[in-house]
């Protein structure tokens, strides 16, 4: 059944990391080297990656997401007492060539069959997104891949979401924005998108401005919400 607010959607725009792409896949694939620190490294790396993006935005000290990702990994490895340059290089390479969640390709294929415009809007740098889309095997399923580098500031700043309306020439209320990050979904909703939170981790809702249109636990539920 089509969800209220999603009947007149012209485009579906996805966050990348955590939504289409599994940001823990790099640490999982290095479990042999990391041992019992693999999960802690993956989670702390992601947390610092986001925190550094927000702090750099507040400080007016922008650096692209590849640099931020490396700095976050350096902090994480130091925090966990890991000194291994080869392992650091391996983790960064795996993050660059990240794995997609199993439901990512399925939902993009469904949207393609329905002739819906699809896009990514991500903190990732253009180089990172090009590599991720290729490694995930979804190159032919996306009409647009948008990086915050064109806004020179990170989500959830309004100018990032404006990239979508500017490039796609679609009003905000006709865009379905999908993110697994509750704060990102809130930012998108506050901007005016029809925001769908893919709550993969079964987390409580963020106490932030912006009213979500829907909450799902898997991307597989999205086509149904759109009436496809």
Question: Where do the language-model regions lie?
Answer:
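Generic structural signal for small/hydrophobic residues in well-ordered secondary structure
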Residues: 15-18, 73, 120, 188
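Short, acidic loop-to-helix structural element flanking the phosphoryl-transfer center
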Residues: 62, 66-67, 84-120, 130, ...
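Asp-based, Mg2+/Mn2+-dependent phosphohydrolase catalytic module
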Residues: 1-9, 109, 116, 121, ...
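A metal-dependent, Asp-based hydrolase signature
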Residues: 39, 53-89
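Active-site neighborhood of HAD-like aspartate-dependent phosphohydrolases
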Residues: 2-50
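Short helix-capping segments at alpha-helix termini
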Residues: 34-38, 79-86, 113, 137-141, ...
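An amphipathic alpha-helix signature
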Residues: 27, 42, 46, 66, ...
